[in-house]
């Protein structure tokens, strides 16, 4: 290489280094500006917050309503958590630490006192009395990190909880699950006692949503493919092992021997590692109507659990347990990630009829609104509006608005359910202009709303459907082959998966563009949503934007019957909605964050909280930081894991 070329190359390196430095500096300055602006806006949001959160009794909230259940005579309630996390973006069944703190606070304020497993045993065996508001608290996931996050709340409120374990993991010091030593450490405090989820967490008779047989899966395999399933699978102890035609592959005696082995192994491990078998058992899965999906399996489970355990939680979805309940057929209410505090308390009220405390939040923000039904919590970001069971929640802004206005709101209630804004409404919230999100469809309605002015399917709005049914089915088979190769221990099964993978990689799969039928995902009650809605009313026209995209431009509307603004939340009625975990929910949380209203010139008329700048800048900052990582580590954008080369991207849009 001659001297000129070397000099030219070095000059290029200097220029590139200068440019890279300038870009990094710009990113840092942008980040600092976003942080300062976010903190400034946070001060705006928090200046009006009360020192303590206000609680209100349920009397006025539920007046005129009847709870579905009645806690008459001796009883207790059971509340469980499938896991605790600090990350609010985890989703699914895992509750955040912040939500746990608020829910425990409300339970304590409602007078609930935790009881032990022995209290429950004595209650059923000896008819010993329980406290008036007896609560059995359970942490189900068996992960040590969840217990660590929950511990401060137990200490603060002098509560005790049962932490469940898997016997198989008692000696696995390198895993996430609670070991024998950790269980002993927890039990040495006065805040924990040990329960059991069984020997293992594994799945049998698994079929995907297209009825393809996926076989029997361990935990890691199931987690990799569960997005391709409906409810067509079972836990290890709940049925006979079956083949692709759903025919038994084991005799009755083989089934009984297989199930007995798990219980006997549990007994052996717990005795060796802990010195005792925990009293509390949670048979997975719940809500089968018995102790398994087959009567013979149910009989064997009943025999074995009564031999080794003192009590069993067999049902999920309601919290009330009466004296005439079976100690081996108890029920717990599992708080979900999407449960607000008031959601949990509304479910408890509906199960028991107890006088409970609801969370009002910021009473100064609450003073701007009139409650018509349901219950509202006024938070730092906005309003969480919780419906009555199988009903509605409705509030009215206590200030008259002009006919012409510009409104922006962030809607973060789950997809399954209804959240709505009604503008230009009369004093009853009727005869106005309504923008409603209902089961992932946006409706623009006027008056009684018999014929919507606009009906927008939000899957299509987002660019979907993204895959054909054939592609989705292919994705599931591909994911199964990869996870078996990565996580299975059966060499024959791994070889079969490798052969299947080779065949799949040579397949030509028709997409939507090829005329194949689109795949439309079924909504689950756990599905979250996050939309920014803008509404501009001017005379007899309305314009709307969703996530920055205009969806209505000067649509003709009437003057309405008043100048009121109502917010509504309502549970989806008519039929049980799909839940992969076989649960239904008769309460809905509408979440109205960052509500801002101005006149057409931009003068503020009402504001709950601005949309933080960091929300808008977050995508840019993340992308910039990813670029920096690639820059300094020499990562080529075109290099991906082999699995990602072969399968269709589930999250990306075309």
What are these regions (language model features)?
Residues 1-15:
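N-terminal Lys/Arg-rich, disordered targeting/topogenic segments
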Residues 32-134, 328, 332-337, 533, ...:
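N-terminal pre-catalytic segment of deacetylase/amide-hydrolase enzymes
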Residues 82-87, 91, 134-135, 155-288, ...:
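Metal-dependent polysaccharide deacetylase catalytic core of the NodB/CE4 family, i.e.
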Residues 165-166, 221, 273-338:
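His/Asp/Glu-enriched short active-site or ligand-binding loop at hydrolase and phosphoryl-transfer sites
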Residues 340-405, 603-654:
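Low-complexity, Ser/Thr/Pro/Gly-rich disordered linker/stalk regions
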Residues 386-499, 620, 640:
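Secretory/extracellular carbohydrate-interaction modules
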Residues 409-411, 475-515, 521-561:
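Carbohydrate-binding surfaces in secreted/extracellular proteins
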Residues 554-601:
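Flexible glycan-contacting loops in extracellular carbohydrate-active proteins
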